[in-house]
């Protein structure tokens, strides 16, 4: 696992490996390139980012609420694996996605998160791209939490989005409250909120443009009592190492 701050190397591998459009999210980001120690060949990419603040199926299973997430700042102790990409033919022929997803739980990533941002990382979210049948199923360290509601708005072209985004910045009085929380931090999914407001102002019914793609939701708890910690029931000193070998390179 090689952490990188080089967008050129990371983006080149990603563009040549995966067809899905990707744009770095606002907030925390750790990028990794996975390299085979023997051959030196690229095996895949990982991005660990600020977690999505609201996914109903996950939040119900964990049992935390907005006070836990924001007042107690437990959302900073969780992250999302927003990129899990194997290179080919590793991905298709050798179940490479399962390997890369398993490496997301490594101690190196947890240590990097704590060193970079000052918060202990106790678990990671991810979602499948299409539907709930996914390569993440059957990985012992990832728990299926349910599915998303499929209520993400379809994005207009980048050209049209930039035009209307700039217009909102200059002309819409409520722009700051649209993309920022009361504490001044960027809300989860700011682009979706901007698109929703664009549609409303243009007289377009947003619900007509949901993609209706229910994605599988997965969570990897790093400790036996991760959920209790996220609910604010215990402190860091009470976290118990997981017995399933999560993050252990030998077991992966």
Cite the ranges covered by each PLM segment:
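Short Gly/Pro-enriched turn/cap motifs at secondary-structure boundaries
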Residues: 22-23
């Amino acid at each position: 696992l090689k952490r990188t701050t080089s967008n050129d190397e990371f983006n080149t591998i990603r563009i040549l490996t995966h067809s899905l459009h990707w744009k770095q999210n606002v907030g925390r980001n750790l990028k990794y390139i996975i390299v085979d120690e023997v051959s030196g060949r690229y095996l895949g990419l990982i991005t660990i980012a600020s977690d999505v603040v609201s996914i109903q199926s996950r939040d119900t299973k964990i049992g935390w609420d907005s006070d836990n997430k924001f007042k107690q700042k437990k959302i900073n102790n969780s992250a999302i694996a927003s990129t899990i990409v194997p290179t080919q033919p590793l991905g298709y022929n050798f179940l490479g996605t399962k390997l890369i997803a398993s490496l997301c739980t490594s101690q190196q990533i947890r240590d990097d998160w704590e060193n970079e941002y000052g918060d202990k990382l106790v678990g990671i979210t991810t979602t499948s791209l299409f539907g709930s049948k996914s390569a993440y199923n059957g990985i012992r360290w990832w728990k299926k939490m349910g599915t998303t509601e499929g209520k993400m708005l379809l994005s207009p072209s980048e050209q049209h989005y930039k035009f209307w985004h700039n217009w909102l910045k200059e002309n819409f009085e409520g722009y700051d409250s649209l993309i920022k929380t009361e504490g001044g931090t960027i809300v989860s999914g700011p682009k979706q909120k901007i698109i929703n407001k664009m549609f409303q102002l243009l007289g377009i019914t947003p619900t007509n443009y949901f993609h209706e793609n229910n994605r599988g939701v997965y969570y990897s708890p790093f400790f036996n009592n991760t959920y209790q910690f996220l609910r604010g029931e215990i402190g860091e000193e009470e976290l118990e190492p997981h017995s399933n070998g999560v993050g252990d390179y030998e077991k992966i």
